[in-house]
Amino acid sequence: MMRKAKAFMSLSTFYKYAKIFDNQTNRKLFKAKPKIGIRATKPKEIIHADVCVYRPLDYTKCFIYFIVDNFSRMILGWKISTEYKSSIMLENLRNVYCKYIFEKEKPPAILMVDDGIENKGLVCEAIENKEIKVDRWVAQKDVIFSNSMVEAVNKQMKYNFLFRHQLLDIEHTQRFLETAVELYNNRPHSALYGFTPVEVFNGAKPDKYFFKPQMEEAKMLRKAENKALSCDSCAFLLEKKE
């Protein structure tokens, strides 16, 4: 502009007039707020099914089938196999359905799955024939929500358990998962405010204010201890440091 002798002004003046004539140039960009996924109000209301892939030291491709309760984050059932097919998912689903008496749930539980082949075929037939009475929802197809709840559990099982150990083969991995799933289900979960998945599945109510009285008491005790420290003790610590 100045080189063509059209106008002469400082950079700040240029931006001033640019803002006047086009208010789009100074528009702030904001990141989209994270969306809250689908949430159940009680155990056995929504369950999620998914498969994750893991390779032990012999490089066998292992498929781990998980079924997770939405409300409690508890792993209700799992299977491991070198095959990726709906019959294994159906077997896992049947075991969970019978073990936790889903038949008595009114209305029927929602089964959230992705559009993978392991969730079609025999699984769809069993649901259509009322052998397994659940409502099957395909994530981001039948509903806008993703299947992130069980995907998060897959990630935790990989990074908190599987990837931290040298597992030789699929048999070794299966034995390890028997312990790992038990540990996961009985370990306090951050989303449950200190409760474990098993406790919440069995009736405990997650409450973020549950430990508030103890936290306030601990805070007051820390303040009292800090005030009780004399200047002499502080000076002693400083001299010792020097």
Spans of model-derived segments:
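A periodicity- and composition-biased signal for non-globular, repetitive helical segments
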Residues: 22-25, 30-33, 37, 85, ...
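C-terminal domain-tail junction helix/linker
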Residues: 130, 156-242
